[in-house]
UniProtKB/Swiss-Prot annotation:
Signal peptide: none
GO molecular function, one term: RNA polymerase II cis-regulatory region sequence-specific DNA binding
Function: May be a transcription factor for genes having (A+T) stretches in their promoter and/or enhancer regions. Binds to AT rich DNA.
Protein name, as recorded: AT-rich binding protein
Assigned keywords, A-Z: DNA-binding, Metal-binding, Nucleus, Repeat, Transcription, Transcription regulation, Zinc, Zinc-finger
Compositionally biased intervals (Low complexity): 125-143, 223-242, 249-262
Top-level taxon: Eukaryota
Record gene name: ATbp
Zinc finger (C2H2-type): 29-52, 312-336, 342-365
Single GO biological process annotation from the record: regulation of transcription by RNA polymerase II
Keyword rRNA-binding listed: no
Keyword match rRNA-binding: no
Protein source organism: Drosophila willistoni
Length: 379
């Protein structure tokens, strides 16, 4: 099991902590500290760890009740093997170990001062535990009291709400013309319950702020509804006055319509002003030059040759180049203008022709693409 053992002459194995006893088929281990017999090595190892605080060959703390000391072991060895000492003396330098080895030397007794300190420490720990238990019990009691108070307040609020509802029902019945006397429910309640009911009623009360409305004149009675059945005619005239709620709704609707009309008129006025300013700016603007930067060919630039083919001539100053297609001439006129329609999507460079843009992309950005990908900028 990881600890040293020595074989003696009487077929017993002695260790620092226990004695392995073999007798026929039976096997047990006797602990040197407490003389307890154990059946297996695992039980013995667990016993010395749990009972005697022995871990990995080192004893951390010596037990007070232990009587296992080096002097006791030597006395027991001298009593059991009296011839061992003589044989060892006759052999000279050779010594035979036949007694169990003591793990450590134990002190004779604990001093009274140490025992008192230990007792005081234990008493202090017990006192702290008792104080903690008392505090815990007090906290639990406070929580229970708070829960009870909340339950009582809830019950009082429910009772007050029921009383207010009953009082409102009674007032409604009395206003309807039925003479029913309802005694307030707060008469049978104690003073504290009455105060809680009054507070709940004040909290539940709702104040409605109604706008001051000018009373409208009474409308004329509605037209009579005539229903003819056969030869008899019955006329029913309804003289029920309209309620105040439809009047309020109509007035609110009229106010909303007026506000919408005002906002629409202000918007229309602002739009008219802006359009008038823009038109005046266009009318008073400078005259455009004759040689504009437009890329479209005029109708007079198309000329027919002697062989019947139609040519498009550039009419920019003294250029005079001829093109077979109108689109080619439009692309050519960009050269004369300052317009740069082809912009690089990777930098801020712009060019007049797509071929220049493709060359720029190949040289500067190492990009190759077809001409259809180079789209001019649209204004």
């Amino acid at each position: 099991m990881g600890f040293p053992r020595i074989l003696s002459k009487n077929n017993k194995i002695y260790t620092k902590l226990g004695e392995f006893c073999l007798s026929g088929d039976s096997f047990w281990i006797v602990c040197h500290t407490c003389q307890e017999e154990l059946q297996t090595q695992d039980q013995f190892w667990k016993h010395i760890q749990d009972e005697h605080n022995f871990l990995h060959g080192v004893a951390k703390e010596h037990s007070r009740t232990s009587s296992y000391c080096l002097t006791d072991v030597e006395a027991a060895a001298a009593a059991t093997t009296p011839g061992a000492t003589a044989s060892s003396q006759g052999a000279g330098s050779v010594t035979a170990v036949t007694v169990p080895l003591a793990l450590y030397h134990c002190s004779a007794k604990y001093s009274d001062d140490e025992q008192r300190e230990v007792e005081l420490h234990e008493a202090h720990q017990q006192q702290q535990q008792q104080q903690q238990q008392q505090l815990h019990q007090q906290q639990q009691q406070q929580q229970r009291d708070a829960a009870k108070e909340l339950a009582e307040l809830h019950a009082n609020a429910v009772a007050a709400a029921a009383a207010v509802a009953a009082a409102s029902d009674g007032s409604a019945r009395s206003s309807s013309g039925i003479d029913i006397k309802v005694e307030p429910a707060t008469l049978a309640l104690p003073p504290d319950m009455q105060a809680a009911a009054a507070a709940a009623a004040a909290a539940n009360a709702t104040i409605y702020h109604l706008p001051q409305l000018v009373p409208a004149p009474a409308p004329p009675p509605t037209a009579s509804f005539v229903s003819a059945s056969g030869g008899s005619t019955s006329t029913t005239v309804s003289t029920t006055p309209p309620s105040h709620q439809p009047i309020m709704q109509q007035q609110q609707h009229q106010q909303q319509q007026q506000q919408q009309q005002q906002t629409s008129t202000t918007l229309a006025m602002s739009v008219n002003q802006s359009t008038a300013i823009a038109a005046a700016a266009l009318l008073t603007g400078p005259d455009l030059p004759k040689d504009s930067n437009s890329t479209t060919a005029s109708a007079g630039s198309a000329v027919s040759s002697d062989d019947g083919e139609r040519w498009y001539i550039c009419d920019y100053e003294s250029c005079g180049l001829k093109f077979k297609y109108k689109s080619r001439m439009e692309l050519h006129r960009v050269v004369h203008s300052k317009e740069r329609r082809f912009n690089c999507d990777l930098c801020s460079a712009s060019f007049k022709q797509s071929c220049n843009l493709s060359t720029h992309r190949k040289k500067k950005h190492a990009m190759r693409g077809i001409k259809s990908e180079l789209l001019p900028q649209r204004f």
